Every structure is written in structure tokens, then in C-alpha cells.
Regions:
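N-terminal targeting or regulatory segments adjacent to alpha/beta-hydrolase or S9 domains
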Residues: 1-68, 330-333
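Short beta-strand element of the alpha/beta-hydrolase
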Residues: 95-103
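Cap/lid segment of the alpha/beta-hydrolase catalytic domain
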Residues: 105-109, 114-163
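Conserved alpha/beta-hydrolase "acid-adjacent" motif
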Residues: 275-281
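Catalytic histidine-centered segment of alpha/beta-hydrolase-like enzymes
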Residues: 300-312
């Protein structure tokens, strides 16, 4: 326990070396944030999506490239409003299609790849690395670091960024389902787990969901955990209380409804000593979702690195078990 917390504390010290140079809070507009209809809020706008696969090259049995498409939720920043990502398409399109969603403030997908990529390449599965709003190449020029604008003291922008993330992810899911064969797997890590869990509330095309070191309530994460302390300071300076934030960000909580994914096809993984994501918050989601399969590791948030072999093994074993007959009788693994 002491070792896990020491590593998390060192990582948090490093995290806070980069922080916003000025307050991000902006006064709320007249637009009400009391949103109840999640189906409407997170809907995918009907459109003829032109899905670009560029810079493609062949690597063994894989076509490797990048994808890019226009977000259906426009923020007004041209960089952020272009959805981007990497893809690794196997010759066998009947193999599972796995979408990965990275964590908050990550600079690349390298941590995610180090957990899963080689294992899934050996399995000959198709892989898509999705980029969250305001991260990587979606980071606006004026932003100081990847992810600065996705979760911040700008209350409405955080809500809209969450909405954009879910809508963008659903667009990719629907494109895969319309153009490829094979089951669809969604894997989220940290903030990516929040987004995949939210997506599961409104998207029925997900066959298996795995959420790793996920949070549940952004309001809790900002107010109660160390990673959010400077955002909380910004909010408190402008008179926002914890109860205010709970109300404003209610629509971003995965625990607000049951997912459309079958309970037996959901895997949740948490760290017992996580200083980024508290057990109280992860327990809340687990109970709200009627207690799907859950693994609790003896580690902190740094388990993303220290426990990556176990994460990969447990997650892939769970997926394979769910894809075996009688769950998916036509799937060839």
C-alpha cells in the first residue's frame, strides 16, 4: 500500500508541474445545464460521414493508418472539431474490432499500446485508437497541454467536451458496425473509462465493455481528489460550491442510468490504493450498474504501468470468454 501511494504521489507531483497559467472559469450562459434526456444529449447527428483512412501502409497482415472525420458536436476550434486516431486493420474483418480510449492529459497512446497492442496483434484483432477532445493533435494552439480544455473550471466547456467525446465515439462505433464484420469491443482507461461508460448508456452496438481505473463523477474527481485540486481552487475562487458542480455536471455521470450493454459483458477494473480515482466513486458506479464483474488490484493509479501485464491478461481473457459460444456463436477466434 505504501509503495503504491508513494508512486501515485510522485506521479501527481509531476502532473501538477503542468497546469493552466490562468483561471479557466467562465460565467455560465443562459443555456440551462439541467439536462435530463441523455438519449437526446448524446445522440449522433445523422450525416454522410466521409471516413478518411490516410497514410496507410501494410505491416504483415495489418493495414496501418490514421482516420479523421468531422465531429458532429462543434466547439468552434477547428483542431478540436476534427476527430482523429490510429487504426490497425487485420485482413480478417470477422475478427473483433477493439476501440481504445485513453486517459486525461495523456500526450499519446503509448501507455495504452504498451498494455494491449502486442497481445492483440498476436490474436489478429482489429484495433482503433480514438483521440479524446482537446488531446493530442486535437489540442487547440492556445492550450498549454494536452487535455487542458477537456476537464477544467470552464463548467459548460467540460460538459460540451464530454458530449463531444461520446458523440464522436458513437460515430466511430456506427461506422465500424456499418462497414466491418465482427464484434465490437470498447476499452477505456481512466478518463477514457468515464467516456466509454457514458457511451454504454446510450449505445446498444457495444458487444463487450472493459473500463480500467475509471472514475464516475467528474464533480467528485475535481472536488475530492488530488488531480482536481487546482481546478477546484479556480471554481471556489469564483463562488462555485461542490453541490453546484454536482448539479451542473450530473449529465456527465455514468451512474445516472443502466448501460445498454449486457451486465455479463461488462468488466470494471480498479486500484485499491488509487489516489487519482477513489474507491468511494468507483464503488458507486459498480453498485448503480447492479454489480457487473469487477476486479480490484492491490495498486494505485500507477497500475496502468506497473500492472499492465495483468490488465492485458485479465481483460483479454474476459473478452474471449464473452465472445465464446453461446454468447457469439458465429465468431471465429
Amino acid at each position: 500500500m505504501i509503495f503504491s501511494k508513494l508512486i501515485d504521489r510522485y506521479a501527481l507531483y509531476d502532473l501538477h508541474k503542468k497546469r493552466s497559467g490562468e483561471f479557466q472559469y467562465t460565467s455560465l450562459s443562459n443555456t440551462a445545464l439541467d439536462i435530463k434526456d441523455i438519449e437526446f444529449f448524446y445522440k449522433v447527428q445523422p450525416s454522410n460521414i466521409h471516413f478518411n483512412i490516410k497514410h496507410a501502409k501494410q505491416e504483415k497482415e495489418y493495414m496501418v493508418g490514421q482516420f479523421k472525420y468531422k465531429s458532429s458536436v462543434q466547439s468552434g476550434d477547428s483542431r478540436n472539431d476534427s476527430v482523429t486516431g490510429e487504426l490497425f486493420l487485420h485482413e480478417n474483418e470477422d475478427a473483433p474490432h477493439v476501440i481504445f480510449v485513453h486517459g486525461w492529459r495523456m500526450d499519446s497512446n503509448e501507455r495504452v499500446k504498451k498494455i494491449f497492442h502486442d497481445h492483440m496483434t498476436n490474436l489478429k484483432w482489429n484495433m482503433y485508437y480514438f483521440t479524446l477532445p482537446y488531446h493530442f493533435e486535437r489540442k487547440p494552439n492556445q492550450s498549454l497541454f494536452s487535455g487542458e480544455y477537456m476537464v477544467s473550471a470552464n463548467i459548460e466547456r467540460t460538459v460540451q467536451a464530454t458530449r463531444q467525446a461520446v458523440a464522436d465515439l458513437r460515430t466511430l462505433i456506427k461506422w465500424i458496425k456499418a462497414n466491418k464484420n465482427g464484434p465490437l469491443i470498447l476499452i477505456g482507461i481512466s478518463l477514457g473509462g468515464v467516456i466509454t461508460n457514458l457511451t454504454a448508456l446510450v449505445e446498444s452496438a457495444i458487444d463487450v465493455l472493459a473500463s480500467i481505473f475509471y472514475a464516475n463523477r467528474l464533480s467528485y474527481s475535481i472536488w475530492k481528489t488530488n488531480p482536481g485540486k487546482f481546478i477546484r481552487k479556480d471554481l471556489e475562487h469564483h463562488g462555485v460550491t461542490y453541490n453546484d458542480l454536482i448539479d451542473y455536471w450530473k449529465i456527465t455521470e455514468p451512474s445516472q442510468a443502466l448501460p445498454k450493454v449486457k451486465k455479463e459483458n461488462i468488466l470494471l477494473i480498479s486500484g485499491k490504493h488509487d489516489l487519482y480515482v477513489h474507491r468511494e466513486d468507483t464503488d458507486y458506479l459498480w453498485a448503480s450498474w447492479e454489480k457487473p464483474t469487477r476486479y480490484i488490484y492491490t495498486c494505485g493509479h500507477a497500475g496502468i504501468v506497473l500492472k499492465r501485464k495483468k490488465i492485458a491478461t485479465d481483460t483479454i481473457n474476459f473478452i474471449q470468454n464473452r465472445l465464446n459460444p453461446p454468447h457469439f456463436p458465429n465468431v471465429m477466434l
